[in-house]
Amino acid sequence: MRLEDIKSPQDIKGLSYAEMNDLAAQIRTELVTTISKRGGHLASNLGVVELTMAIHRVFNMPEDKIVFDVGHQSYVHKLLTGRYRTFCTLRSFGGMSGFPKRSESEYDVFETGHASTALSAALGLARARDLQGQHHHVLALVGDGAMTGGMCYEALNDAGDSHTRMIVILNDNEMSIAPNVGALSQHLTDLRVSSGWTSTKRVIRKGLSCLPVVGKPLQRILSWAKKSVKSMFVRENQEGFFNNLGFHYFGPINGHDLKALEHTLEAVKQLDEPVVVHVLTKKGYGYSAAEDKPERFHGTPPFYVETGTARKKGTLPSYGQVMAETLSEMAKTDEKIVAITAAMPSGTGLSYFAERFPRHMMDVGIAEEHAVTMAAGLAAGGMKPYFAVYASFFQRSFDQMIHDVCMPKLNVTLLLDRAGLVGEDGATHHGVWDLASMLPVPNMVILAPRDLNELRTMMRWTQENESPCAIRYGRESVDLSARYPAQDKPFRIGEWELMEQGEDVALLAVGSMVAEAIEVRDLLEKRGIHAALVNCRSVKPMDEKMLCQLANRPIVTMEEHVLTGGFGSVVCAFLSGEGLPAPMLSFGIPDTFVQHGRRDQLLKYLGLTPELMTQRIVIALKNGEKH
């Protein structure tokens, strides 16, 4: 069967295993071909081809429900649910999302993008089913490190305690599937999933419990013997862990053996209890470049299929690279510096630091809340912790930031990567709410560099800082030093940089928007409008003195952040509180979730390109002249 002919999962239910193997090869070819052009999450999807096929053959979607944790491994699911024709638009502006999207298909029952949420969502779906007297199956596919997140264990504890019927598929792609271990564990699994074995276990357990005196001791002896034998083949005795939480454990299963997967899933369908199916898969399976470097192809830019090398490489280092290099230089002379990541050493750039200072590098897993409070403990103990995290993931640690860092005024530095619009990953990954969460919090210092050089300057300043501090920077690197060299005077918080004079209007830009504001000023100059240009690098505290001096002309604020609660709203509140009646125009992100697409496309969509902002400023100035 051709992949392009699949309209729904029903189309693959009657295929032979030979036909299914051919279909798996087609899917892998499509994944590699499309992602090589569009970018995206390749390694994880290559690893779940057979698993996703088995799920759709055994269960009846969309009546049965599946929640994909993180959601980045849902590409195969999309291809099997009639979306082949639009798959070529993956992650493009107006095209298919790289994550499950309820508006995209009835098969996408729950939207995900951040880790460790699937079990809680699936439990909610299962309880909704039970409360309404329905009988369909609810599955959660979780893996790729998401089990390091605390939410998973909260959900497991709740589901096991309530004995809610649901199926958790643990996609374990950290273990290799050695033939001998795989064969032995598969043999044990075959025994355990057979209906006869399951029934026999129940009968034996019931019979032993009825025997006077010797019944319970015999039960304990047999249980001990079973666990001893199983522990030889099941690594780290996962069975006991999940059983203790109230789940029936199956596995480990070879995640690339379609027959074994279907056999197991057919069996667990019959159980009226919470179940964990432990599946072993190999990231990047079927494409050698991704198999050899799975982390490199976890989330990849467009690449050449033949070599696996990126199609386009930037000429500038990333903000993460500059951050890590600067932090490493600082650590050479300061033994108190500690770097922290939440399972993203490569994405944040901290792999560089880890190679040089392994004892001072801490990867806490997908546990942002824990990371912040642990950093607070480090600071209370006399260390200087730096937590590098994507701005969108930092949202999870809002309470810890207030309660554990800012209230005691501890010296924790947050390095907020991907602040602003991140591009093709879309709404779940845009870092556009961090300022709104941090600006109201006492003791917090918030900085936003205009370019790579200013990031270096701010990083070095933090060595002398004793307050909670956040430095936010975008995904796309900027270097403005050719036109605007770094100032000679030392960096100080509460001071802005007046980059250009101008009496007609003042442009106040934050971080990544400084580059856009420079172009706006140039366009205004061509129209005879002279604009002051200000780099508002110290977002909190603001440069109140300079702001008061600029308030004798219209004020325009520019930020790659939501308008509500952002920099512009704080400027407006300050001017109002001081009784300064300067007309204001604020540019930022409106009250909407921004879709996926290239940053330049999204800026245009939001009216934040230099040309569109200039038009609005000119109109506003003309309207102001009429009053």
Q: What are the roles of these predicted feature ranges?
A:
Residues 3, 174-323:
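Long, well-ordered, tryptophan-enriched scaffold segments
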Residues 41-162, 337, 341-342, 350-351:
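Cofactor-binding active-site loop characterized by glycine-rich and histidine/acidic residues
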Residues 65, 281-395, 400-410, 467, ...:
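Non-catalytic terminal/interface segments that mediate subunit docking, oligomerization
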Residues 263-266, 298-299, 308, 318-333, ...:
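Glycine-/acidic-rich phosphate or pyrophosphate-binding loops and their flanking alpha/beta elements
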Residues 302-306, 310-313, 423-425, 434, ...:
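Peripheral docking tails and interdomain loops at the edges
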Residues 363, 521-550:
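Generic long, charged, amphipathic alpha-helical segments
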